[in-house]
């Protein structure tokens, strides 16, 4: 790659770096905002509908996390091959990613559709009849969308490995707009209720998959995948993808199970605490989403550095993006904190819920800029270098010790309110940050060999 005049030779110029990272950050922010708008529209259908959507989405998020993890494995392999300038192997890896992720998604869809009702009863137990009916409808449509989510994730990861992050962002934004417009038409126009929301989601996901596969066929792309029906499994490359994707998938899955355990504890604290925690979760997600986008983009950057044999560059860009992420986190935290009271007021929260929410956001705004970046950003680089098992073990250990166990003890034994959730979270972030910092400077994470 070219370098800017007077600069030390780096694989990426600042211009190239921002061109890669900014679309990923924008995509993450818009997806989060669109998701919030989507939830608000569904909430107008009624309490049974919003309860059903909330319950089913706890399953859907877990499935989507699995696809995202597999896609991340494909991104790492394709990025490293692109760093080697080995387009042929990058293309072969892309084909295998599309094959395996689609196959897994189809199997999941068949299982979820065939065993739809028993699965819902097994996971959620006894719920109100109306909620269960709505859950069955919503789950059916969303399960049908699994292959399309998987294909879009795979296609997007391949484009990101080619440093084209603008196309996945554009497709995602259009898809979210389609989903909201579809909700408006089907929910409010045709009065289809939860089925309208689910159908709109299915259509938007089909759109994503078709468009990303269409552009991936273009001969202009360095990684060009054509004749999808002729793709045959390559056990070696599939094993490479799964070796990276499965540990990340376990890590993401454990996070979702931990989240459910925390929700179960918070639900014992009363309605005001539940509402306060729900709003705090939304606001905390907003102040961190831009930095997460930087981390996702960093995986592609470090993957190329490792593939090119430039381990020094992997270290350089990790440090650089940690600094950028720190600035972004500080600005995001201050901005969201400034909007907290207006949002509490507009959300119609009770005085008690609003007070608890503001108290928790105050501490998040103080603590997050100090401990969040070292707890998460270096981990993206380590995964891109193939150091996925360390991340999985550390993340699962700190989550169950701090986020879950400490939270439960503080709530149930010492009578803490919802702030216990965030004490557990801060402890988790702090421990992660310490161990990731030691791992990063020890440089063992650079010794993994992902590709030949």
PLM region descriptions:
Residues 47-58, 135, 139, 198, ...:
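Small-residue hotspots at the loop-to-helix junctions and early N-terminal turns
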